[in-house]
Regions:
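Internal intein/HINT superfamily modules and their associated LAGLIDADG
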Residues: 1-164
């Protein structure tokens, strides 16, 4: 394609960020990606992909990409917190996956983001060891990630003084 990649500047309460976007005008391509589970306005309806679409060996890569977009890792002097926002169904599946890949028990508790009837929840886990277990699952031996969040993982991994 010859369509030029344009860069935009987003200004929000989180700060200023550069971003690019892609416009897809091919009906065939749109139908193909819909068959792979890509949907419009995913925020309130996204479910974890079925194994016929996403093989289990790629779960951590999917979750890492999702975390890069809709998650956070907060490292402060007194606390560590891992958080992902999404639909209740998606988050419950992610909790199951974390429990299958870790020695720690991640309670199957999802919290409402806002006091309304929308399917918008979050999960949150704290403590160095529990958080590090999740982050190692997501990032170890990976080379595609959001650099800003990867650097926080490395900071947590190399942290000797934080014992929460």
């Amino acid at each position: 394609a010859t369509y030029p990649i344009k860069r935009y500047l987003s200004q929000s309460s989180y700060g200023n960020f550069n971003y690019s976007r892609i416009l897809i005008n091919s009906k065939k391509l749109v139908e193909d990606i819909k068959q792979k589970g890509v949907i419009n306005n995913k925020t309130l309806v996204l479910d974890f992909p079925k194994e016929s679409i996403l093989n289990e060996k790629f779960y951590r890569h999917f979750i890492r990409g999702y975390f890069d977009g809709d998650g956070s890792l907060v490292l402060s002097r007194n606390s560590i917190n891992f958080k992902i926002c999404g639909t209740k169904e998606l988050l419950e599946k992610i909790i199951d996956i974390f429990n299958n890949c870790s020695e720690y028990d991640y309670q199957k508790r999802v919290f409402k983001r806002w006091n309304n009837d929308k399917n918008n929840y979050y999960i949150s886990y704290g403590g160095k060891n529990k958080t590090l277990s999740i982050m190692e699952y997501l990032y170890d031996n990976s080379n595609i990630y959001l650099d800003r969040k990867y650097k926080k993982y490395i900071s947590l991994k190399n942290s000797e003084k934080v014992n929460l």
